[in-house]
Amino acid sequence: MKNVLRIVAGLFGAFFLISGLQWIIAPGSIAEQLGMPLLEGVGLSAQIGDMGSFFITVGVMTLIGVLTQTRHWFYAPSMLLLVAALYRTLSAVLYGAPFVMSAIIVEVVVGLFLIFAGPRIATED
């Protein structure tokens, strides 16, 4: 069971890491995949910086948790994902943004998975 959890967490980590790298390598492509336009000016800087750092952080911290088998590495990426889902929901409720159920489901499922898997993968604290 532990190795299955490590493999799944590793796949999630790799996915987020690759997505984060795409924000530097091909920002137009990853923006399109996420259903958003590539912004211009200061917006472009914020979009690449914020989105890239989000995905890189989730990916790298998850992979460090998988490789070191240390549970605390899974908590920050989980929090980032769950708060992103919360803010997506609030943006829809408060400001009329589209409710992107598919993204919210991914963020909640992966975020909760990391909370579940962390202690089961860990060999140390």
Model-identified regions with their sequence ranges:
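Membrane-helix boundary connector in multi-pass membrane proteins
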Residues: 86-102
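Aromatic-anchored segments of alpha-helical transmembrane domains
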Residues: 16-19, 80-90
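Core segments of alpha-helical transmembrane spans in multipass integral membrane proteins
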Residues: 43-64, 79, 83
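Membrane-water interface at the C-terminal end of transmembrane alpha helices
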Residues: 110-125
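Cytosolic juxtamembrane helix and N-cap/initiation of the first transmembrane helix
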Residues: 1-15
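Membrane-interfacial loop-to-transmembrane alpha-helix junctions, especially the N-terminal start
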Residues: 70-80
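Hydrophobic transmembrane helix segments
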Residues: 15-42
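Small-residue-rich transmembrane alpha-helices that serve as helix-helix interface/gating elements
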Residues: 101-113
